[in-house]
């Protein structure tokens, strides 16, 4: 995809990946090919907003020929390809081939806090930084190569509790909040982070695009669960896709009663909804 700043795109599309654009079981996006091709034809920026690391996203972006900025590790940072915007990106630091705007604390601080909080409340936790690639693969179901990419973190630390009671887990969460940190759960794994949210990163990017294009842009976001609430709350049109069983996350519906409900889970629903957006529905 070419740089959108020189194209007459009317939309910005922000998308979660696993369970949204990507099939939750196979990680395939084949059911969304029609919409992806239409996005490219129109020159619409497609910005991935995900819990994945920069290393993981670089591979996926190459496969999808995506040259746009992306948001990693639950809003920890924005990575903007060098030369993408013809303006100064305030607060950005050079990281490899990108300008990086960081919202989260450095990874070393987060892992140190994980160990300190665990010791404080007497919780037995195991973080990614304490596991090698083989152990991460065994605990997550990822392949060895995928596990190595997931291990290359900048902001957010996945971890699990080893036999902790609900009371100890609650104490851990409260102790983390006392330190100004966030604890979220995604399946078996929990995530410790600080100072960031997906919506904050999305808002920052929307402002950059509008400064560059200087025309009306409609921001659209797609997600499927509570962890995407911040993302969905930050755009003009929020789209909630159903869970694999066809149900919608009631916690999102209660907070965003006017959210657009997608017609099907995963890439099938993603495809249909994006095409409807372009038709003005």
Identify the role of each PLM range.
Residues 3-9, 29, 189-281:
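Mg2+-dependent phosphoryl-transfer enzymes with acidic/Ser/Thr/Gly-rich catalytic loops
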């Amino acid at each position: 995809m070419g740089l959108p700043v020189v194209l007459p795109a009317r939309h910005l599309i922000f998308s979660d990946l696993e369970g949204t654009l990507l099939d939750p079981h196979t990680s395939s996006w084949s059911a969304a090919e029609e919409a992806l091709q239409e996005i490219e034809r129109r020159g619409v920026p497609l910005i991935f907003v995900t819990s994945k690391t920069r290393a993981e996203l670089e591979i996926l972006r190459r496969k999808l020929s995506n040259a746009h900025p992306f948001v990693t590790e639950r809003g920890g940072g924005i990575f903007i390809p060098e030369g993408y915007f013809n303006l100064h990106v305030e607060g950005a630091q050079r990281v490899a081939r990108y300008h990086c705007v960081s919202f989260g604390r450095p990874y070393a601080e987060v892992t140190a806090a994980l160990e300190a909080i665990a010791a404080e409340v007497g919780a037995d936790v195991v973080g990614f930084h304490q596991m090698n690639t083989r152990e991460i693969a065994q605990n997550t179901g990822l392949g060895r190569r995928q596990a190595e990419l997931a291990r290359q973190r900048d902001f957010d630390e996945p971890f699990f509790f080893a036999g902790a009671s609900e009371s100890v887990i609650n104490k851990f969460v409260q102790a983390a909040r006392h330190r100004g940190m966030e604890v979220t759960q995604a399946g078996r794994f929990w995530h410790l982070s600080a100072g960031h949210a997906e919506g904050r990163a999305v808002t920052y990017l929307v402002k950059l695009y509008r400064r560059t294009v200087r025309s009306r842009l409609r921001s659209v976001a797609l997600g499927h669960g509570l962890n995407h609430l911040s993302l969905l709350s930050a755009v003009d049109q929020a789209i909630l896709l159903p869970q694999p069983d066809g149900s919608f996350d009631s916690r999102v519906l209660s907070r965003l009663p006017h959210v657009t409900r997608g017609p099907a889970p995963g890439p099938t629903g993603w495809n249909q909804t994006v095409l409807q957006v372009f038709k003005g529905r």
